[in-house]
Amino acid sequence: MIQAFDGKWSRFRSDSLVSECSHSVNDIPLDRDEYDMLQLYEQLHAASEGAITPLIGQVLEDMGYDTHYSLRPKDYIQTASDWQAQLTLHADRLEFKAPALIDIGAAGKGLLVDRIATLLKKDAPEYSIDAGGDIFVGGAAERIGLEHPQDQTRAIGVATLQDQALCGSSSNRRAWSDTLHHIVDARTNTPVSHVVASWAVASSAMRADMASTALFFLSPRIVESIIQKCESIVMYDDGKLQYAVSKEIELYV
């Protein structure tokens, strides 16, 4: 399952379908959950006025977050292609109108976590999955600390999860200089600087993963209007928090 997903969606593999679509006009066939993921991308792309897009792939490559992890930005960084000019989303496929490199890092790992959770649920009454910060807890409840983005020995709070996912994003986790990290505004080709971390809880890891990225660009209110039944927390560069959470999330503020 993991190999098949990676072979389809990873832009870090030269033999993946995503890499193939960066060199030749092609379609990517979609399962229902993949279509749902790209629908959310499309809605958030519109809400963010183009800041959020899977077409950020070439921008990240040019910035140094590339296949070889060179972490050396090129002298010229391409701008992200226009969604309407480049892609058409159908229920069964993603149509490319011209070659382009996409990156589904905002939600792809979460989607894979959901698929693994579905597999485990068949035989395990209780289980938990931690895929580098994309967490799903099934069965019995678990308390998960929300790591402070500037001090790994501290937590800003605790979330109690039961048949839910928690995903966090932080600008310091995949950063390769004082100014470059992996959460980039496609309109300006610059990493987001006013938000340092976000967390989201949702019924699926894909939705929580997508929400945690979207919170770097949109307010919790807007994100929750698109990704419903989602709880969110944002920490800004001045240390202030904005949040909309239930009693299952305890914040130390």
Predicted regions and their residues:
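Mature catalytic core of soluble alpha/beta enzymes
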Residues: 1-253
